[in-house]
UniProtKB/Swiss-Prot annotation:
This is Cortexin-2. It comes from the Eukaryota. Keywords: Membrane, Transmembrane, Transmembrane helix. The keyword Lipid metabolism does not apply. It comes from Mus musculus (Mouse).
Length: 81
């Protein structure tokens, strides 16, 4: 008699578990937010590795030489202090 009762209650529980196992709106929103954060983190990691592998590709070609020429001309006032 108890085995029949357990089998009967497990059938009822499986019907209720299916309806309760669906995610609520808050859980769906949370999983979507975590997924977006994981994608963003992955993109940042890829960008950082690209910069580490070739750090000078992201720099403009005329930076240091132009500033040195301006420094030699005396355009920087604080250089005298």
């Amino acid at each position: 008699m108890s085995s029949t009762y357990c089998g009967n209650s497990s059938a009822k529980m499986s019907v209720h578990e299916v309806s309760e196992s669906s995610l609520s709106l808050e859980q769906k929103t949370g999983f979507a937010f975590v997924g977006i954060l994981c994608i963003f983190l992955g993109l940042l990691i890829i960008r950082c590795f690209k910069i580490l592998l070739d750090p000078y590709s992201s720099m403009p070609s005329s930076t240091w030489e132009d500033e040195v020429e301006e420094f030699d001309k005396g355009t920087f006032e604080y250089a005298l202090a």
